[in-house]
Amino acid sequence: MLVVESLALGIDRFKSLIVEKVKEILHEKGIDIRGVYERSDAKVRTLEGMERVKGIIGDEFDTNVEIVENGVHYMIDVVNGQKTGFFLDQKYNRLAMQKLCKDKRVLDCFTHMGTFALNAGIAGAKEVTGLDISEYAVEQARANAKLNGLENTVHFKCANVLDELPKLNEAGEKYDVVILDPPAFTKSREATKNAIKGYREINMKCEHEQLAR
C-alpha cells in the first residue's frame, strides 16, 4: 500500500504524475503495491486555498495493513490514524530506545499508538507505561501490545500528560527511562513563546529528582 499526503499547491498539481512515478520505481525494485490511499486532509492545506482530501485513489482495496519495524508488529490505520498512519521518521530513534530499556521501568509520554513503548517492551523492559490524551490512540496501542504478546508488560492509560506527571510525582513513582515525544505545540511564529513554555514545563516535570531515577 502507498499512502500519500500533499500539503503544497505546487506538489498537488503534479500529484498524479508523482504517484505513478513512485509506483513505477517500486515496481522496478520488485515491490508491487495493492493500492494508493490519500491523506491530504491536514488543515494546513486551506492556507493555500486547497480542499482537504481523503480517500482511495484508483481501484478499491483493503486498507488494513500490518507492518514490522525493528522486530515490532503494528496494525496501521491509514484511514483514521494521524497523518499517513505511521511516523516513519522515528524508526532509528525507536531502535536506539531498545538499547536503553532492558530490565528497566519505562514511562512513555505522548505515546500515541505506543511505538516507543512497544520497542521498550520488545527489548525486555521490566515494566512500561504509555500515556496519551487520545482514547483512540490508546486503543490502537493496546491492540498492538497484544499483537506482540506484550499486554502483561506494556500498559497504556488515556490521560493528559501535563496533568498525569504531577500525580505520578505525588505517588512517588520512579522510572529508569522517561520518553518525551510531544506533539507540535505551535505551527506558527506567533505562538512560539507559548510553545517554548509548554516544552519547558514538560521537561521540568520530569526532572531527575522527581520521576527519573
Language-model features, listed with the residues they occupy:
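Structural motif
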Residues: 5-9
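Non-catalytic substrate-recognition/targeting regions of SAM-dependent transferases
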Residues: 14-86
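Rossmann-like S-adenosyl-L-methionine
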Residues: 54-213
